[in-house]
Amino acid sequence: MKEVIDTVGRRKTSVARVFMTPGKGRVIINKLPVEEYFRDEVKRLHALRPLVLTEKTEDFDIKVNVKGGGLSGQSGAVSLGIARALTEFDEAARAVLKQERLLTRDPRMVERKKFGRKKARKSFQFSKR
């Protein structure tokens, strides 16, 4: 077994590189504790969901470098990266994570703005006369 498990998670325009080692349960994101980086509890819980579901919150030290996008996309990227790292470590966790759809990259991206319109779908006001 490898000492350090290195995986990548992506969501929207965010990319998270996850480095997982056996340890005491410390999670560091961009050199900050997870509580400081994701101050919003919902985003923090979303990022750490794979650890909670597999009941391995105290078994690993996780170091994450994440860049791009906003906090919502970053928490999704971190979640996918952690889920992929857990499956590399323990194949039994794969079934639980797959059932919760945590191993699937979310394909939803921002729709591009079209010319002749205000935004992707919103048009300028239409006047019949």
Curated annotation (Swiss-Prot):
Tell me the organism's taxonomic lineage.
Bacteria, Pseudomonadati, Chlorobiota, Chlorobiia, Chlorobiales
Q: Name one GO biological process term.
A: translation
Regions annotated as coiled coil: none
Q: Output this protein's name.
A: Small ribosomal subunit protein uS9
The record's HAMAP family line, in alphabetical order, gives: Ribosomal_uS9_B
Organism, as annotated: Chlorobium luteolum (strain DSM 273 / BCRC 81028 / 2530)
User: Which protein family is named in the record?
Assistant: Belongs to the universal ribosomal protein uS9 family.
GO cellular-component term (any): cytoplasm
Q: Which domain of life is it from?
A: Bacteria
Sorted UniProt keywords: Ribonucleoprotein, Ribosomal protein
Please provide, alphabetically and separated by semicolons, the GO molecular function terms listed in this UniProt record.
RNA binding; structural constituent of ribosome
Cite the NCBIfam families for this sequence. PRK00132.1
Pfam families, alphabetized: Ribosomal_S9
Entry-linked PANTHER family: RIBOSOMAL PROTEIN S9 (PTHR21569), SMALL RIBOSOMAL SUBUNIT PROTEIN US9M (PTHR21569:SF1)
